[in-house]
């Protein structure tokens, strides 16, 4: 499976996929810059009278519900409909769905308009969507339990898609295959937007590589490796310096680094 990760990164660099992102106002710039850093092309288009057509031109669609307005909600329905009609991968980031009931209702309605290729959230969000008890604080997960794999597999089977739960150890599952990504750094929890950036990267990789499971693993591993390197090169204590180094290091992750430092446990 490890060769799939390097294949996915090569595909991303070669194809420069256009990623249509409807994301939150807190991290829109971070998502755009992270996509540019790895070689994708971001388009933060969310006007309701444009998204249906635009989503059909993209390589993938990234829906992030972090600061969901009524206007964004309508745009998301139109965009997922357009993307699904064209067979374009749709990545959902269900930010704070464990804390805000309206967001779970929105996700259910999105499922009526189209199909998710990947659902990427923290463990609390994944457990909430899977109908399991989840401990959350706003957009953050307080869960670190041993039932994360079960939650991911259950949600993957329910939606027929890949599910990823990020945390100290990232979990990726598709109902049959699963893996644990053991790279990363606690510094990623000390800046706003690391999870959103990871979701955007998943969209970038899925826009270039057909195997959504492999693309998701490659994206999250890229984010984790960049975080490790950013901590090393920035001194590891100042979050603002770390953020700047993170974007730089995203641009430097290559096949050799994945082979040398990637710690992925295939289950």
UniProtKB/Swiss-Prot annotation:
Its gene name is: thiM
Q: Which organism is it from?
A: Desulfitobacterium hafniense (strain Y51)
**HAMAP family the record matches:** Thz_kinase
- Could you tell me which Pfam families the record lists for this protein? HK (PF02110)
Q: Which family does it belong to?
A: Belongs to the Thz kinase family.
> Gene3D superfamilies under this entry?
3.40.1190.20
Q: What class of enzyme is it?
A: transferase
Q: Where does substrate bind?
A: 44, 193
Q: Per its Swiss-Prot or TrEMBL entry, what cofactor is needed?
A: Mg(2+)
What name appears for this protein in its UniProt entry?
Answer: Hydroxyethylthiazole kinase
A Gene Ontology biological process annotation? thiamine diphosphate biosynthetic process
Q: Does the keyword Zinc apply?
A: no
